[in-house]
Amino acid sequence: MRLRNFYSALALSAAVFAGPLYAAAPAMAAGTISGGFDVGPGGFQGNFNPLAATGGFTWLVTYFEPLVIYDDKLENIVGDLAKSFEISPDQLTYTFKLAHAKWHDGEPFTSKDAKFTFDLARNGKTGSVFAARLASIASVETPDEKTVVIKLKEPSPSMLDTLTKVMMLPEHALASIPPEQLAKNAWWSSTPIGTGPFKFNKYVADQYVELTANPDYRGGRPQVDKLINRYFADPAAAIAALRSGEIQFTYVDSNDVSTFSSDSAFRVIEGDSFVVNYVGFNQEVPLWKDLKVRQAFMHAINRDAIIQSLYGGAAKPANCVYVADRLVPKAIDAYAYDPQKARQLLDEAGWDKINGSKPITILTYYNSPLVANVLAAMQAMLAQVGINIVPRTVDTPTYNSIVYKQGGTADEFPLIFAGLQNGPDPSSINIGLNEKQIPPAGSNIMRIRMPAVTKALDAALAETNPAKRDARYQDVCKATNANLPWGTMWVANRYGVASSKLENFIWTPAPAGGPYQAHPEKWAILE
């Protein structure tokens, strides 16, 4: 099929995927902002436990808070619940001076809460996704109620970046729950308390969460009385709700942007996603053991055509896990579209004996028409060289239950189409590739055990000289390009659309939703 006709057919299929599936709407009171804050890549995680969160921080940070946080441009890490912090010259001691803050039940936030949180986050029994990332912590000390001292076993230049995602938790509310029972405890969706500008009020399962203003917030009472997060099974339904005025914000795909950009009733927000989209090869599945098969996979996909035809040019090809110029050396393989070479590589690998035309499931949590069309394009291209993939789309909780399951069958997900944060700090990619991060320790869900990749990552993580750090991550780029633990596709821009009625509203297309300084206490809506 010619590409032009093929993509015309895909455009038609997008209309089919866009059928409305509406979430029940709560009554809108004056002074209420409602949004689809978890619409988009990753979607709703299925729980409100920040220790287990791999996304959804745009919403979580409205009522939970970390010690430190990125600014809204994702350029600098600044204090949040820590009013100040300093790092010792040997980079082994981090000292945080805490702000005067209260939990939503009126109890004071103290250093004991911070230590309690870090102890939970380092304990794999809690289901924490941070256990491996915080393994370099030797101790957490509390010399007084407003001081926290973290001591490391060895320098960890990525430590501050990790701490931006560790939301502080109340010791007095959670200490009685055994660590192994914490992950799925009802507390997270019924009576959670944080220190943020909004307080948890109620959750109507799979419909919406309602927060109310925290009158005692240290940054001042929020400008609106309520903040509501609506859940949508279909992104098209969120767009319809935005147009009708039921919500004032949602994520949109690049192919929806043009319908809003010329409408003064809305504001389009665009930015770098810092997320590399990739095809993951499950390394416990024999299909992908031969590098030539993985190379053939790359040469079979016309990434440039997909980027131009489906992403509207709003993406950049990724030939390794990074696209930032400073992290990508010139002498790497571009894996140019070459179906003839793909067939040759498959012949050399003996693909007909390995699998031939048998169907191979490619699992994804991306539920948008755009990604459905992307996978359809990949399916057609790969079929031309003799690889038969069959897309399977599930919601994020189901996806996580499959890929993180211990003792599961690798055949459940021989391939995935997913995304993982590769910035603002380049160390963030480590959790998906390093052998030490294989679940339950981390998020190396493809069970990658490639010594060259792990060695390059470890060297980059240990580099404390800023002048040498980029060169170390160039080595990571070289290792992932040569060994293909993933088939890296592209890094795309991301978009949000906000009603022009919103004032002081900050949304940044950050990986995993941030967190970053969004100042939700300053958000307002024109009546």
Swiss-Prot record:
Record has tRNA-binding as a keyword: no
Main location: periplasm
Single GO term (MF): peptide transmembrane transporter activity
Gene Ontology annotations for the cellular component aspect, listed alphabetically: ATP-binding cassette (ABC) transporter complex; outer membrane-bounded periplasmic space
Record keywords, A-Z: Peptide transport, Periplasm, Protein transport, Signal, Transport
Position of the signal peptide: 1-23
Location within or outside the cell: Periplasm
GO-annotated biological processes: peptide transport; protein transport
Tagged with keyword Protein transport: yes
Subunit structure: The complex is composed of two ATP-binding proteins (BAB2_0817 and BAB2_0818), two transmembrane proteins (BAB2_0815) and a solute-binding protein (BAB2_0812).
PANTHER family, A to Z: PERIPLASMIC BINDING COMPONENT OF ABC TRANSPORTER
Function summary: Probably part of an ABC transporter complex that could be involved in peptide import.
Membership in a protein family: Belongs to the bacterial solute-binding protein 5 family.
Name of protein: Putative ABC transporter peptide-binding protein BAB2_0812
Annotated source species: Brucella abortus (strain 2308)
